[in-house]
């Protein structure tokens, strides 16, 4: 807001443009997926497969899915519940960010797309960011698989 920055990378697309608009500043988002970056999962739960309780993790992921469905299906009620947890959330910025976050939720958070992970690894190799791809089983597991 100080006018000292022309661009940022890694900003939260649901907050920064809303904050700028509230402050009367114009902004534009460059969507990474429109600039050649393959689609990737932004929120990944991490657990040690050697020590995790698979049943607990499965139930947690299922609860996440049910909560996501409730939020999407009941945006006003879910906003009231969320914003009711802390007074500092009850402002225009957070209300706008909530609205802009809803379409970004994965309706099936447990879904595991092997191809997406392999495509992103290939992108990282081709960009010189990693030296080689790894077997998908060494970097992620499908917690819903038996």
Regions of interest found by a model, annotated:
Residues 2-85:
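Pocket-lining segment of extracytoplasmic ligand-binding domains
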Residues 9, 29, 92, 133-134:
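A generic structural-conservation signal
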Residues 19, 31, 74, 90, ...:
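Poly-acidic low-complexity segments
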Residues 53-129:
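Secondary-structure end/capping motifs
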Residues 121-146:
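Conserved C-terminal helix/tail region of periplasmic/extracytoplasmic solute-binding proteins
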């Amino acid at each position: 807001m100080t006018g000292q920055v022309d661009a940022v990378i890694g900003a939260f697309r649901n907050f920064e443009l809303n904050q700028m608009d509230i402050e009367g500043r114009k902004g534009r988002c460059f969507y990474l997926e429109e600039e050649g970056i393959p689609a990737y999962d932004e929120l990944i739960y991490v657990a040690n497969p050697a020590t995790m309780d698979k049943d607990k993790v499965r139930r947690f992921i299922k609860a996440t899915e049910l909560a996501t469905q409730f939020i999407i299906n009941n945006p006003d009620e879910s906003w009231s519940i969320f914003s009711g947890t802390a007074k500092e959330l009850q402002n225009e910025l957070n209300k706008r960010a909530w609205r802009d976050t809803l379409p970004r939720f994965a309706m099936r958070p447990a879904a595991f797309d092997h191809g997406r992970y392999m495509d992103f690894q290939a992108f990282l190799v081709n960009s010189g960011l990693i030296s080689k791809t790894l077997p998908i089983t060494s970097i992620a597991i499908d917690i819903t698989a038996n």
